[in-house]
């Protein structure tokens, strides 16, 4: 079998195509890092749901999150989007730290803002974290409100979450943070 037989028709090996592929793989790696971040020792209730407990949205439909916790803390909300981009929804330039009280049902965004399902269609995941301290992380500029990126940004969020949860030596304290997630789909 010659090397040309290994290439699938329609997939080029140009520098541009390889660059796009590398970008996609980096974004997917970043999303996986945050998507896999879990606390197996979590002993308190913490939940994130979508408006109407829906998980599938058509383009242009409203998306709203509801977060509940059995413990006081600060909420971090990260969207691992349908295009592989990691977007930090909370905290952001407008809401620098989002405090939740035990038993409270937090709605985000509030009534003054609407999130809509946007292209590309596909699957995504929203991961919510609760920590005793707010995240110490560079936020987006006021013009941008939300900060987004790929692998480097995901690593930055992960490190900020570890610091906010607290460390015992090099290990993250397991009793100081929690996480919840919801998988969603955007359809055409």
Predicted regions and their residues:
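Secretory-pathway glycoprotein ectodomains that are cysteine- and/or Ser/Thr/Pro-rich
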Residues: 4-188
């Amino acid at each position: 079998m010659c090397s040309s037989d290994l290439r699938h028709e329609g997939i080029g090996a140009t520098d541009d195509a390889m660059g796009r592929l590398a970008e996609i793989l980096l974004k997917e790696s970043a999303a996986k890092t945050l998507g896999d971040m879990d606390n197996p020792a979590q002993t308190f209730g913490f939940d994130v749901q979508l408006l109407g407990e829906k998980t599938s949205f058509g383009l242009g439909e409203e998306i709203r999150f509801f977060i509940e916790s059995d413990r006081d803390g600060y909420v971090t909300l990260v969207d691992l989007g349908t295009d592989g981009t990691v977007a930090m929804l909370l905290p952001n330039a407008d809401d620098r730290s989002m405090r939740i009280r035990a038993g409270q049902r937090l709605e985000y965004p509030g009534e003054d803002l609407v999130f809509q399902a946007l292209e590309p269609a596909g699957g995504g995941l929203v991961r919510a974290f609760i920590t005793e301290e707010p995240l110490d992380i560079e936020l987006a500029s006021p013009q941008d409100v939300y900060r987004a990126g790929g692998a480097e940004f995901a690593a930055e969020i992960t490190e900020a979450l570890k610091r906010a949860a607290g460390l015992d030596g090099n290990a993250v304290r397991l009793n100081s943070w929690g996480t919840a997630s919801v998988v969603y789909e955007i359809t055409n």
